[in-house]
Amino acid sequence: MENYKFSTLEYKRPDLETRRAKLAQWKAAVGQAESYSALRSLIFEIDRESCELFTQYSIAHIRHTLDTRDEFYEAEINYLQDTLPTLSGDEVALSEAIAASPFRADIEREFGKQYFVSMDLQKKLFCEANIPLRQQESRLTNEYQKIMATAEIAFDGKTLNLYGVQKYFEHPDRTVRAAAVKAYSKFYEDNEPRLEEIWSELIRIRNQMGKNLGYENYIPVGYLEQGRTDYGEKEVASFREQVRTFLVPLCQKLYDAQAKRLGIDHVMWYDEKMVFPDGNAEPASDDAFMVRTAQKMYHEISPETGEFIDFMIDHELMDLQNKPGKASTGYMTSLPSLKAPFVFSCFNHTIFDMQVLTHELGHAFAGYMAMRSQPIADFYSESTDIAEIHSMSMEQFAYPYAEWFFGNQADKFRFAHLQEALTFVPFGVAVDEFQHICYAHPEMTPKERTYQWHLLEEKYMPWRRYEDDAFMERGGYWYHKLHIYLYPFYYINYTLTTMGAMEFKKKYAENRDAAWQDYLKLCKTGGSRSYLETLRYANLANPFEPGSVERACGYAEEILLKQIAEQAK
């Protein structure tokens, strides 16, 4: 299928009873396989049909998020999220049959030990009693997404969605910024009663899943779902502590310098995005220009990225414009039967647009390479703690081309972007610790949980000031972070992978070719190795080792503090 466009792809609801019957047939055939060759053929047949099933799911999911008001795709995604979990037992039974095969050693020799590690995770996570809980979970997360996607905020004489109002967070007029964040805050305050209920229900449901699997709560399940096989809560807690002791004081310095630059006593919440007194760097407001320029940039970076971006544009595998009803998120997903990534976002004509064209396309490039390098779909996607290295490193690789997007404001872009790469990390670890607290203490009331967020802001973001916004001051900021609702325990990945991205930044400055080859290795390996094995393979450091945060971020710290000193002259 060479000449397709995403818009013309046919969606066909998967026949799940046929799939169930196929799973039983494959299980029997695996047990009857008399040679590794016969078993190998079955593995590839299973892989092909699984790719097709996931591709149809992806088409439905993408089209649902493109317009959450579309009743057909809303019904389809609800149907699939209700019914697909009922196949889990059959999937696990098939995996167990493959794992018990007398040809297991042959499988491991060809596909590596990670093949069975992934199967073992699938087995550990399966519990028949959790199927209806998964269905309830999906309905609740879909409701959260719909609340966010259908937001209508009256501001500046317009009706804006959440992405639209965030553009004003960078307005040069401080009173406009303050009014914009107040309007944004009010949306969450108005919706707080239902958002509290959804979160309480998700905690209850997920903790019950954990208990059904033999755990005290959901936390160990969340780690397994993220594919974490070679580190756990202890290592993550030690990483958060490194962030608190090294990065939090550095970020305080950065915000103190920003206050001086802006001519104010303290950076308020509505000032945090305003890095320069005469305005932040803004890219072109022409979406088509941004995409054309990104295409030119990717051709400059490498032959591989040039081929990739042409593929994405030729097949219309990006939807980037902000539209009514569109989900307020950004993501990359895949259409594995086509070996095609898909990128979704909402441009708002700020430096965020540049991040989309690098971050989400960094994910997509990694998927594109893995789908062409790995033999089976199990390895097309890497563990989540590796995935964000691809995206965040691509953001750094784009720095030499900033003039193409920002003209004489390129230096502003580079400074603001690098500063945000570091100042984001304390927020990211706060999100992670918040989730640990909530699942470990389900007895907390909604107001007590929100107060815990307030305490975490004091711990990790002591510079944060909300002025007269009582809702945010008592801890309301966390409601906006959809990962807390939709992707439990994912968010720490952004902070761990920032360390890898900062390493790549330094390597790219010192030896571009060597850094690019390591990056290609990282992308091509997909999910064929564990987290720590993948880091070693790509010549990256272990972020849990003492002093790793300071070593990874030291180069960026040096750049920022040097520029701050020059700005102060």
Stretch-by-stretch model annotation:
Residues 253, 265-328:
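Gly/Pro-rich turn-and-neighbor structural signature
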Residues 244-246, 370, 381-409, 417-419, ...:
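Post-HExxH zinc-binding segment in Zn-dependent metallohydrolases
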Residues 116, 120, 228, 357, ...:
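C-terminal, non-catalytic "cap/extension" segments appended to globular domains
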